[in-house]
């Protein structure tokens, strides 16, 4: 399913400031749903879950491609409109509604700005043993991850390097999804009671909930591509180059800095076709 909420006074992500926000998101929803139906889920139902009456031409496009539309109020996980990523929390609200109102064996939700290009059958098989979530693979030298962990510490009162799960992907069999949702609701209740505010949206809640379950990284099936004009790559601590000698000649040059650190430069001189 693709969850999407629209409320004029509510903040969305920092990535979109367009005045025609509704139109942009509905186009994204159509692409996400249609790609899932055509490429991945021919034997499964694809659903747009939303709190609005979908206008034409988008409603006609979705229904014309056998995509279901479920209307569900934004009546849970709602922190109010003046909250960073306020609308992102609707994903959890939508999941709660479909778990109550439908009876499928497996459930998955994805962000609206995705393109699905392969079958989900192997994902469903994985869900027999695990909840599948996306580890965004931030290390401690990434400022965003350090800030995320600082919020976790402030909320829990202890240091813990939990996995930062991305909000763009979740998949589980129904019984696991129901238990996961219950844990998410407990985190939400604790946040509300303590008037605790996070700047990391739904990812804060799902990452805390994931600690309690047998979660497997879905990184083999999904990858987050940052396509903005500015991107800060992570520093790689270890590079592994299997079978490198079969593909290219490698010259290794070493130099010792004044600090005594050894730096190894791999210069790829010649590529050999195999």
In which residue ranges do the predicted regions lie?
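A short acidic, often aromatic-flanked loop/helix-cap motif at beta-alpha or helix-coil junctions
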Residues: 75-80, 139-141, 223-228
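Conserved catalytic core of nucleotide-sugar-dependent glycosyltransferases
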Residues: 120-187
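Catalytic core and acceptor-binding pocket of nucleotide-sugar-dependent glycosyltransferases
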Residues: 160-248
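Long, low-complexity C-terminal extensions of enzymes
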Residues: 235-274
